[in-house]
Amino acid sequence: MSVSANLVKQLRERTGSGMMECKKALVEVDGDLEAAAELMRKKGLAKADKKADRVAAEGRVVAARSEDGKSGVLVEVNSETDFVGNGDEFRAFAESVAQRALDSKVEDLDSLLASEVDGKSVETLRQEMVAQLGENIEVRRFIRYAGDHQVAQYLHGARIGVMVEVQGGDEQLGRDLAMHIAASSPVCVSPDDVPADQLSSEKEVLLAQARESGKPEEIVEKMVEGRLKKHLSEITLLGQPFVKDPDQTVGDLLKAKGAEVTRFARYEVGEGKEKKDESFADEVMAQVRDS
């Protein structure tokens, strides 16, 4: 049967799919718009399942914060390519997930995926995005802060996001700290927060290096002590030189402002993921196989 251009247009607006896909679905269900939309949804879920094993290591980090500034979230949403990750549809989806994570107050990823936005679960919306954009889309992780202190956030483009909780100080201090964390990548707030096993491992490495000098053991111990102190200042927020004024440490800055950092999180797109090195021809072939 033939279907009207208006019906095809309506289905495209509802599903975000291509004209030929919409026309084919409408023909298959004899022009029933609702049935065509449901058919395309089911086909989209099947496509999502087929794409689930493909590596998604691009995308963006997004943030949302409450009006009073005392709660906030960071969310990483992944795509397979930066082209899709920079697109308007992907950005809108990622931002809606972040807002949902903030509003719903969920504590884990499964609960976030099960929560609803405009009557659809985040997981259903994710699967629809897979069908619409033709790539594996993954809501990878999120973190939520809520308490009595101010939460500051900073996004460096779409690839790095920081959230820091600060007791005392003002809005500008919070933003400066978030920018510093984005640039300097501290592991934790203070030396007391460094895991004991990590500290012990680093000390063993430094000890082995120092002993190669052939110096007496008491000298070696002092060498290790100095190098360990330097290492801790490099990886902890309080010990790092402040990026906007390297003559003072972040710890000195906070002391001068009468403020304290209680916790922070730094997300970078794709960190810890193994990216698949694929040629353009391989990428095209993969898309053909999945179409």
Curated annotation (Swiss-Prot):
Keywords: Cytoplasm, Elongation factor, Protein biosynthesis. GO terms for molecular function: translation elongation factor activity. One of its GO terms (cellular component) is cytoplasm. InterPro entries: EF-Ts_dimer_sf, Transl_elong_EFTs/EF1B, Transl_elong_EFTs/EF1B_dimer, Transl_elong_Ts_CS, UBA-like_sf. It is found in: Cytoplasm. Pfam families: EF_TS. Residues 271-291 are annotated as: Disordered. PROSITE patterns: EF_TS_1. Residues 81-84 are annotated as: Involved in Mg(2+) ion dislocation from EF-Tu. HAMAP family: EF_Ts. Belongs to the EF-Ts family. NCBIfam families: tsf. Associates with the EF-Tu.GDP complex and induces the exchange of GDP to GTP. It remains bound to the aminoacyl-tRNA.EF-Tu.GTP complex up to the GTP hydrolysis stage on the ribosome. This is Elongation factor Ts. The lineage of its organism: Bacteria, Pseudomonadati, Pseudomonadota, Gammaproteobacteria, Chromatiales. The gene is tsf.
